[in-house]
Design a protein with these regions (language model features):
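Beta-strand C-termini and the immediately following turn/loop, strongest in propeller blades
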Residues: 322-329, 339-340, 370-375, 382-388, ...
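C-terminal outer-membrane beta-barrel translocator/porin domains of Gram-negative envelope proteins
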Residues: 612, 686-692, 698-700, 705-712, ...
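Beta/coil-rich, acidic/histidine-enriched accessory regions frequently appended to metallopeptidases
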Residues: 32-42, 48-50, 213, 247-376, ...
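Amphipathic alpha-helical substructures
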Residues: 88-90, 167, 188-284
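Outer-membrane beta-barrel initiation region
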Residues: 572-573, 578-676, 680, 684, ...
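Juxtacatalytic substrate-recognition/specificity segment
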Residues: 31-168, 185-186, 208-211, 253
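Conserved blade-ending motifs and adjacent loop-strand segments that build the rim/top face
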Residues: 500-503, 537-552
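Short coil/turn segments that connect the beta-strands within blades of beta-propeller domains
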Residues: 317-319, 377-379, 422-424, 466-468, ...
């Protein structure tokens, strides 16, 4: 379930795969995904305990103990509701894995990639596990648990491991939201907007359902669809639909679901649902659209890369607005400065990709909360951003975009900054021990003080113009209400708004006499209101169709206006309105103070039974982790390769056993790896038998060898201890030590004899070895690269490694240095200038053998046709988009991209006479590999280079490459053009 209504970010390899690749032997799997991956850092050590309740097997840790009874009560209450509604019982204890905070939840090993801050929780179908943090307010936590538990019931009703087709997303997520039993105001807003503005897709057409910029709309359409089923067919109709879905999904088709469940055709179901939904929201058709308000301050999406506005803060002068907006080019959020006069873009304060932080932090309330703030002098914009485990407060200059100040927080979910008029302090909200409070931060010292210190969820603090009074929201009995207190005495809390509805994002008027805020009292729609602090009069300024949120006064030459975020036709826009003519006055009945109100209570109250507690076993619950994946590819030499991996993990994903099989040509490679991911330092043991091939014509014999005649193999059999220590998300140390049996040989014995004879004639050692090596290695790996669906877009990647193999008892002796450095320069939207330098050097009595060539390494040359103990290759490629997607008889192909590339490199063996280049007269063998042709001036001798053009497109998820290359020695270019086809990812 998503907290913020946005897409998940693109991430690198999972750490489990990255760790499994850290072997002491060459790993054939690297040709499938040639990236190093980022790190999921375990900042905390969890001493896991297990508690068994009537329906759950709860995994928690000692710091969670005080919350156990409460959360189990929520879970058992949810089970009672969902089981009753669906008339279904789960036959096993459901694994419920709990974290105290979201930052701890993000460290789970059960999510396949990185857990973004926008993911509230998840349920997975392989082991039917629920995984969630508990730092939501009580009523929202109850709803969250109900949502995820419904997924477990869905997985049990419609088993995912035997399905021929996927369950539609609107069914899975819609039923989960339906079972919560309530509508979130923002969710109801999106479905009302879709109904009134004629944007309801046909649910039976999956491609239409997924065609929304706001992914939450799919959840909400599903929620509404199940309410429609209940209204038309009753709860029994919902159950009939689910059991029919089970039968059809398992059987391989879904076209007959509606006929079998409801006796209507799919199109008739779509029409009936659309009619019902439009009729439901028909009374709202005459409400205000954004065009009724006046001025639109949003960036022009047709003229800029910026789309919607999710948070904003006006400057003190009212002439500029800082806004968090979506950047289509980067695929990320940015903070921009907008002109309040003509909505022109003044500056992007967070332009481009940065390693200073991982992501901007939005309010937990998304658009219904505050996420950024101008300082009172108008010189800087403040916001929270994620770096490491927690967030830091950043102050960025509006003139230069440079960071003026960065203050790390040791609290969770720090958000909603507000800079005080004294210039030395700031207000913000944050979580400690799972409870949200308002804090006062000293900007100079970096220290903070808890101002509210109560059991309620407090958020969105704002300061009065004179700097003496704080206004904020507190969640009471399932609703957000507005409170104030004097900054000098925070204990004197005063409740300003009352009633069973939400009042959010309060802020003072410029004269401090009013508080502006958004309220969903009327029709569960956020509208703008003000409360006169002297008279208590409440005025309402909008009557929105969608919703108007997060008001802030906008002062300027034209007088005072009220800026706010409005939702219409699926987009969040920044609007403004005059406050001189309110829509109406609102009466309010003052009620009891919040401290006298009993907060949320679950339906089932569970008493913890101490005898049901125990410690979790280290390897408890080992289980096959999903279906084994299948990877395939084709080298530029026409060699097919493929592989698969079987993974066994414990219930927490901390203990992993990986069994891998890879095939290249007729060669087979196998390895089994154990990796422990429970703590920050990951360690394990790998046993392997890997065989790879290369082509080599050394010692001036290249004219005598053809490709197959030069075929050699390298077989490594042994075991390695492996370890990784993440320094942060982007950098890590990798360690390995092992014992490996090396067997290197030419496939053709006659060729091997010829090479040995030639080595003796030259008085140099033979370069292929048989024996045992005991390597000990360390590498520094870094990857800041940002990826898109086609591959790298921006950033850098490097791996710098050293390995030493001592000689004792007849083992092979070698010392090896290996460095792979890549840099990606983004050009425009998705064009990339990619560079790479990979160098290696192995010394000692029996140095290691490296090989490269073909595919993405040195295009135009045979695959793995360069080999040696030392050498390098360098690449420079301009990759650019041609077609985003294209529909063909074979299916959807794309994106289609072009490549202009050039590469240079070479390798040689110990003792071999080798000259990379020269300026002396010589012979070029580019067009005549036997006799050559005379050349003068600078040219390559033993070095090699190529350039050309390529075409890449994706089919069934696999990148297909078509390359046309010219070979060159930098003096002579080949007359013929070499064509290569290969399947695999670019570096």
């Amino acid at each position: 379930m998503n907290r913020h209504h946005g897409l998940l970010p693109r991430t690198g390899l999972t750490l489990a795969m990255a760790a499994a690749l850290a072997l002491g032997a060459p790993d054939a799997r690297a040709q499938f995904i040639p990236y190093f991956g980022k790190n999921k850092v375990k900042y905390d050590d969890f001493a896991w305990r297990v508690y068994k309740s009537p329906h759950f097997e709860v995994y928690y840790y000692p710091e969670f103990e005080q919350h156990l009874a409460r959360v189990v009560s929520y879970a058992e209450s949810a089970y009672q509701k969902v089981s009753s509604d669906l008339k279904h019982e789960i036959s096993f204890h459901i694994p419920l894995i709990l974290y105290k905070t979201h930052s701890e939840f993000e460290q789970t090993n059960l999510f396949p990639t990185f857990v973004s801050e926008g993911i509230l929780a998840f349920a997975e179908p392989v082991r039917d596990r629920m995984v969630l943090p508990i730092d939501e307010p009580p009523d929202k936590l109850q709803g969250l648990i109900t949502h995820e538990l419904t997924h477990i019931f869905e997985f049990d009703l419609v088993p995912r491991n035997i399905m021929q087709r996927n369950v539609p997303l609107w069914v899975d997520e819609g039923l989960a939201d339906y079972e919560r039993g309530i509508w979130d105001t923002l969710d109801l807003m999106t479905i009302r907007d879709a109904a009134v503005t004629d944007q309801i897709p046909r649910l039976s057409r999956l491609e239409e359902v997924l065609d929304f910029a706001n992914p939450r709309v799919v959840y909400n359409l599903g929620h509404a669809a199940f309410e429609f089923m209940e209204a038309r067919y009753g709860k029994e109709g919902i159950r009939q639909f689910l059991y029919t879905l089970r039968k059809n999904i398992v059987g391989g088709g879904i076209d007959d679901i509606y006929m079998q469940a409801f006796r209507i055709k799919p199109d008739e179901f779509d029409e009936a649902f659309e009619k019902w939904l439009k009729e439901r929201f028909k009374p709202f058709r005459d409400k205000q659209r954004p065009s009724d308000y006046g001025k639109d301050l949003s960036p022009d999406a047709e003229k800029t890369a910026y789309t919607q506005v999710y948070a904003f803060s006006p400057s003190p002068s009212g002439e500029i607005v800082a806004a968090i907006t979506g950047n289509r080019g980067d695929g990320e959020a940015d903070i921009i400065l907008l002109s309040a006069k003509d909505r022109g873009i003044i500056r992007n304060l967070t332009k481009g990709f940065t390693d200073d932080y991982e992501n901007l932090a939005m309010s937990d309330q998304f658009v219904a909360g505050r996420s950024i703030a101008f300082d009172p002098r108008g010189d800087a914009v403040a916001f929270f951003a994620r770096k490491g485990k927690r967030r830091s407060l950043f102050l960025v200059s509006v003139l230069t975009g440079k960071t003026l100040r960065k203050i790390p927080m040791d609290l969770d979910q720090a958000q909603s900054p507000c800079l005080l008029p004294d210039g030395r302090h700031a207000l913000f909200s944050a979580l400690k021990e799972g409870v949200a409070d308002i804090y006062l931060l000293d900007l100079e010292a970096g220290t903070y003080k808890n101002l509210t210190a109560d059991a309620f969820a407090d958020a969105d603090p704002q300061i009065s113009p004179d700097g003496t009074v704080v206004v904020y929201t507190r969640r009471v009995s399932g609703h957000d209400k507005i409170y104030t207190f004097p900054l000098a005495d925070p204990s004197r809390k005063t409740q300003l708004t009352f009633g069973p509805y939400d009042d959010s994002t309060p802020t003072f008027s410029p004269d401090g006499m009013k508080v502006y805020y958004a309220s969903d009292e009327e029709d569960e729609i956020y509208n703008l209101r003000s409360l006169d602090l002297a008279s208590g009069v409440i005025q309402q300024y909008t009557d929105a169709l969608g919703g108007d949120m997060a008001p802030a006064p906008l002062t300027g030459r034209g007088g005072e206006r009220l800026a706010f975020i409005s939702y219409f036709k699926g987009e969040y826009r920044l609007q403004s309105i005059e406050t001189s003519e309110p829509v109406k006055e609102v009466e309010q009945e003052v009620q009891l103070a919040a401290d006298a109100i009993v907060d949320f209570q679950p339906d089932v109250v569970h008493q913890v039974v101490s005898e049901n507690k125990r410690k979790k076993g280290m390897f408890e619950g080992l289980f096959l982790e999903g279906r084994p994946p299948l990877n395939v590819g084709v080298t530029s030499g026409g060699d097919f390769f493929g592989g698969t991996q079987v993974a066994l993990t414990d219930v927490l994903g901390d203990q992993n056993f990986l069994f891998t099989a890879v095939s290249v040509r007729e060669l087979r490679s196998y390895d089994g790896t154990y990796i422990n991911l429970a703590k920050r330092f990951h360690y394990g043991l790998s046993a392997f038998d890997t065989t790879r091939f290369f082509f080599v014509s050394p010692l001036a014999l290249q004219q005598s060898f053809f490709r197959e005649g030069a075929f050699a193999t390298q077989r490594y059999t042994g075991a390695s201890l492996i370890g990784q220590y993440p320094l942060d998300k982007f950098r890590r140390l990798e360690l390995n030590a092992g014992v490996i049996r090396v067997d290197e040989a030419f496939e053709n014995p006659e060729v091997e004899a010829l090479v040995r004879q030639r080595a003796e004639q030259l008085g140099v050692p033979y370069f292929l070895h048989k024996g045992t090596v005991v390597p000990m290695g360390v590498s520094l790996v870094s990857e800041t690269t940002r990826f898109r669906e086609f591959g790298p877009l921006s950033g850098h990647t490097y791996s710098l490694g050293a390995q030493y193999s001592p000689s004792f008892g007849g083992t092979l002796s070698r010392t090896t240095l290996d460095g792979d450095v890549r840099k990606y320069f983004r050009i425009g939207g998705s064009a990339v200038f990619a560079t790479r330098l990979h160098g290696f050097r192995s010394t000692g009595d029996q140095p290691d053998v490296f090989y490269f060539g073909g595919n993405m390494e040195l295009r135009g040359y045979p695959y793995f046709s360069f080999a040696g103990n030392q050498g390098f290759y360098a690449n420079a490629e301009f990759r650019f988009p041609l077609i985003d997607l294209m529909k063909t008889p074979l299916g959807i192909l794309g994106p289609v991209r072009g490549t202009l590339y050039g590469g240079i490199g070479g390798a040689h063996f110990k003792g071999e006479q080798w000259n990379f280049s020269t300026s002396d007269p010589g012979r070029s063998y580019v067009n005549d590999p036997v006799f050559g042709e005379p050349v003068e001036g600078f040219h390559l001798v033993d070095g090699r280079a190529s350039f050309g053009i390529g075409l890449q497109f994706f089919f069934l998820g696999y990148p297909l490459h078509f390359d046309w290359s010219k070979l060159t020695d930098l003096k002579v270019t080949s007359n013929n053009t070499r064509f290569d086809f290969w399947v695999g990812f670019d570096f």
